[in-house]
Amino acid sequence: SGGAGGNALMFGIGGNGGAGGAASGVGNGGVGGAGGAGGALVAIGGAGGAGGAATTGTGGAGGAGSNALGLFLGLGGSGGQGGDSAMGSGGAGGAGGSGGAASPFGIDIGIGGAGGHGGAGTNGGAGGAGGAGGSSGTVFALDLSWGGAGGNGGAATTGTGGAGGTGGFAVAPDFIGFGAAYGGAGGLGGAATGAGGTGGTGGVGAGGFAALGVGVGGAGGAGGAATETGGIGGAGGLGVGLLGGAGGAGGPGGAASAGSGGHGGTGGDALGLIGAGIGGVGGVGGAATDTGGNGGAGGSGTGLLGGVGGAGGHGGGASVGTGGSGGAGGDGFGFVGAGGNGGNAGTGVGVNGANGGNGGSATGALAAVGGAGAAGGDATSGTGGFGGAGGSARGLIFALGGAGAAGGDASTGVG
């Protein structure tokens, strides 16, 4: 195993962890060392070492990035990459270190380190999780934080691609000033000849609990591409903020060259405590030869001022089969509420058409508008896809339900 990196003082960068040793025989690769801690005022954590390669065993896991806490700036170290394996499974990527700042009156910036990528092998290694970013909560100041991105899953030769790592959590709890927090993006799923890896979930963003602040959830990672079955897209992260919140977008499903596309990830929910909440859009389904992946559902939006649901993801197209169905729009809740529109059905030339997504419902203390449904896909000799239903609307003064969509045509079958 690799040794740990050294620590740094004051304005400093921690040393990187050493790489794990390679194994030429039956054994597994060595584990990468952890990174060293950064300085007290400005802290940059050291990166984790890479895992060692293996021949018939499992690649070594990547070392973890170091946590970094500085007075004004903290940047977590990135996780080490997992080791590859020629005839075994790839090693897992190391987790990114957290980054934080603790200045009582200045500008606090905390950035989480990225997770390490998984190693390649017969089955791909999982990507490491991104590190958290945050601050201690300053007064009369500005808090900015970013969660680290999740590492990508490793590629697979004969099996399943590695799952993408989860994006890091971000928090900016400014008391009187302004805080903004952005969750880290999920890692990509690993590519494979069999089944592609699942994309990582986006990180949560939470900002300004007691002051003006916004929180934005991280986007979900894309599913891995594959020959047989594309990977599922990762879900978008939750966004929470006193002033406003926005959910992260769902990751797209992985494409498949000869099988079924992966489904799109669900959009992240959003909460604006006194402002607006906007749900994340659903991920697009993966394209394929036989069957397209379904689109992901849009996230819900909730806010005292207004809530807007995210749009559903479109279904993936299919070159010789049936396209994927569209995802449903997210619901909206608030003083004014609006439901998200449903996603379109994927194009295809199969016997039956894919269904269009339903519109999201809306609830508003003053007014509400339901989301529109999406049109159903056309068919050849079977049944056309159902048109999506319009979303319901409930408002004290004004309410408008969403429009329903047209059903799909059929050339020699039933519309």
Locations of regions flagged by a protein language model:
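Glycine-centric low-complexity repeats
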Residues: 1-415
